[in-house]
Amino acid sequence: LTNRNVGRRDFFKIIGGALGISAISYYLGFRDKPDLPPSDASPDYADGGIGLPVFRGPYLQKDVNLAAFLFRADVNVLTQLCDRSLNIAPSSPYRYVPLSSNVMLVYADMLVSSLDERDAQIGSIPETEVGFWVLTVAMQKTSNGEVPHHLAWFLPTVFVDESNSIATGREVYGFNKQAGTFSKPQDIYSPHLTADVLGFKQFGGEAIAQKERLLEVSSSASEQTQTSWSDWRSVRDFFAGEIMNSIRADMGSAIIGFVAQALVDHIPLVFLKQARSASSAEKASYQKVVEAPLQIKDFFAGARLAQSYKLSITPLDSHPLAQSLGLQSEQTNLLGAWLKLDFVLGLGTEY
């Protein structure tokens, strides 16, 4: 399910088709953002005058040490995941479709602070997280069918070691953030790591949650010479090429061309923001799809990891990662990279 044999002539045909789709959808009004109520119509958020535990956005992540690993997954499972986690909000103008059969595991260790004038005075909070990222195409629903509108990164699961981050992420954006503890890499150039959770190996009326190893990323190979990047453009071009080579063949040439064009844009994150009803436990009192922009502020260093890494996932009833993401309990990565950078998670849009 890859497109590694796209030739130069075919590539330009695909790009031309994408430009045609974009132009048609633009002039028909399909690519316009839907009208949303003004934010000043909402009541003020009551926080007692202090931003803890839920800071005001936007949010600066600085001194970020990041490692990313790409793994093959079952695209049918990823489709089901998007359908039950994103495509259930009736007010959303989009249907999110996995772009490939790949999942990216991202480890990040950083300092997080608010860029809001008031909350920026609080300071920075250390945070470590491990999450899974799925690249999707947001298909806009129109009276004439669906048209590709933009790309979006879906983060179905993120584990974090800091409580304020969990509260802010879940409440503001709808991050599915859960508590975890980590053994961190000694240095980001050789990112061996583990993640533990409070969980259940098996559910049962008498079962008691305890600390369990959820996953491990390791390599038995010795550290090898790495291909480094001197600027963010080089990083972006590398990952854009890998994304183009991994697009599902059943997407068709028009979608492939659209993706080639869309990769030059900033790709937002997408979440399902919801709250369980207090009066009807099986219902949601609030449910919206949220998209939020993520922009690189400063890039310092980065390189592709030359050695292979193995992901080991422990089967837990409370955290069925392999089952929900279409991963194997043990598998080797397709590629990996480390980065040192700062980035900003901006204010989102609720649909």
Q: Where do the PLM segments sit?
A:
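Hydrophobic alpha-helical segments and helix pairs
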Residues: 136-185
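Extended, compositionally biased
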Residues: 93-151
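C-terminal region of N-terminal signal peptides and the immediate post-cleavage residues
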Residues: 31-33
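N-terminal secretory signal peptides
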Residues: 1-6
